[in-house]
């Protein structure tokens, strides 16, 4: 009976250890995924910032050209 008890305790102990290791690996994987998500978010933010900046410059130059072309006929009259 004592042998059975020791065997049962050994099996339970090994099961808990393996469960603990699996949970630790799972946490590490989740942390890595979060870091990848953060990096992707930063890249998207930088991309949008660049796109908006470029669009702003284009709109500004377009408005300047339109206003400039409207001002020229008035000065000729």
Curated annotation (Swiss-Prot):
Q: Which GO terms describe its cellular component?
A: extracellular region
Q: Report whether S-adenosyl-L-methionine shows up as a keyword of the record.
A: no
- Compartments (UniProt record): Secreted
Q: Does the keyword Signal apply?
A: yes
Alphabetic keyword roster: Amphibian defense peptide, Antibiotic, Antimicrobial, Cleavage on pair of basic residues, Secreted, Signal
Give the signal peptide, or none. Answer: 1-22
List the InterPro entries hit by this protein, alphabetically: Frog_antimicrobial_propeptide, FSAP
Xref: Pfam families: FSAP_sig_propep
Q: Which residues form the propeptide?
A: 23-43, 76-77
| Entry's family note | Belongs to the frog skin active peptide (FSAP) family. Dermaseptin subfamily.
Q: What is this protein called?
A: Dermaseptin-B9
């Amino acid at each position: 009976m004592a042998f059975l008890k020791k065997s049962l305790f050994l099996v339970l102990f090994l099961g808990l250890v393996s469960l603990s290791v699996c949970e630790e690996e799972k946490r590490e994987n989740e942390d890595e995924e979060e870091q990848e998500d953060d990096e992707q978010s930063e890249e998207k933010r930088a991309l949008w910032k660049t796109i908006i900046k470029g669009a702003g410059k284009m709109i500004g130059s377009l408005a300047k050209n339109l206003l400039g072309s409207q001002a020229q006929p008035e000065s000729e009259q």
